[in-house]
Amino acid sequence: MKLPELRIGNLVAKVPIIQGGMAIRLSTARLAAAVANEGGIGLIAASGLPFDELRYEIQLARKLSPTGIIGINAMVAATQFAGLVKTAIEEGIDLVVAGAGFSRDMFAMGKESGTPIVPIVSSAKLARISEGLGAAAVIVEGCEAGGHLGTDRSAREIVPEVVAAVKNIPVIAAGGVLDGRDIVEMLKMFFQTPLYYVDVVIKQRIKQEPSKM
């Protein structure tokens, strides 16, 4: 099964997988670079890092993956959230993923610098608000995900609602995706969306014989 590319703003990931940002000092430059080198999007967990350490991690990731897509994941609830985002943008980070809260200010920072901002959401309402504020994409987390959760509902319930709510940005499902069957199940939620670039024949095969994909 050939997976479609993931387009976020001007970024194009050959493999539509974003590695989660696990704080503190778990998702570091080396993990992010390894994922980026395989065609996915690697994230450095910024929360809990001093600004100079974050700069070092971003620079190291760039050295290890010169052409890969490297982003940060930061918790909005963290005291130094704005400073972490500003520092990452100054270092030329490719995108900013933000969860554990919601910040309108981050969209202005992203717009000013041309950096894609990708909030983690748990409802169609917040996804719609995010798109209106300028989000380049949204990540949908349900109760299956780890970390700081905003709902007790399954992502499998929320994702179709978000897909219907937003108009022109990618929707990335997160949490509870453990194997190939889970990937197929999630992909089937996006079949009717215009941003899902998969041949109609492939879509039909997945619907009929998901166990063989």
Could you say what each language-model-derived stretch is?
Residues 1-172:
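Active-site entrance/lid segments in N-terminal catalytic domains of soluble metabolic enzymes
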Residues 23, 177-178:
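Catalytic metal-binding/acid-base residues of hydrolase active sites
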Residues 31, 145-148, 152-172, 178-213:
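Conserved active-site-proximal phosphate/metal-binding subdomains
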